[in-house]
A protein has these predicted regions:
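Low-complexity, acidic/polar, glycine-enriched regions of mature
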Residues: 9-194
Length: 194
């Protein structure tokens, strides 16, 4: 049997999508650990994205067709800890220039490539790009969908060295280091686009 599309025919409800845009109230945080011979003397750092954008296209009847893109401005990442303000400025400057090289790499991106729904959880295979290097990362995303807002939370860990980044070293002879593994916590709040 041959099916011929009819111009102007209504599209199947299963293909109808709802588009959500990330709100500034969303929270994107990076947590670092410490390593090295004198790692005990170092600090774990909490880094917050102050500028980001993102879009979620959700297909309620076919969640596996849904997709998401998130972009984080690297020059708007800000170190929140340790509590010493002078130290925060110093660590933020080192992160932007020595670690992320924001002059050459202005964004970090996360883009879904496959989605599988299980209850209120989505298993997402995503492409994560940092410093022009891309790796696939598996995500488990908890999703709550209200009438006008989607909320999604996930946590994932990547190794800086996978993206050509040498973890920051400081202290006497580089004996205090940031650990290679960094953890991203995302709490996305996304209003429905009209």
């Amino acid at each position: 049997m041959l099916l011929i599309p009819i111009p102007g025919a209504t599209q199947s409800p299963a293909r109808d999508s709802v588009v959500y845009e990330l709100a500034p109230s969303s929270r994107l945080v990076v947590r670092t650990g410490k390593a090295g011979l004198l790692g005990f003397a170092g600090h774990e750092h909490l880094i917050q994205a102050r500028e980001f954008s993102g879009r979620i296209v959700y297909y309620p009847q076919q969640p596996e067709s849904s997709h998401v893109t998130v972009s984080i401005a690297t020059d708007r990442l800000e170190v929140l800890t340790p509590p010493d303000t002078a130290e925060i400025r110093k660590v933020t400057a080192a992160m932007r220039t020595e670690v992320l090289d924001v002059a050459h790499y202005s964004e970090i991106t996360l883009t879904s490539k496959a989605v599988e729904k299980t209850g209120d959880t989505l298993r997402v295979q995503a492409v994560f790009t940092m410093k022009s290097r891309t790796r696939t990362v598996p995500l488990t995303v908890r999703v709550l969908i209200g009438p006008d807002t989607l909320r999604a939370t996930t946590t994932f860990t990547v190794r800086q060295s996978d993206y050509g980044i040498r973890p920051y070293r400081g202290g006497p002879g580089g004996t205090v280091r940031v650990a290679d593994a960094v953890t991203f916590d995302i709490d996305a709040i996304a209003p429905r686009r009209p």
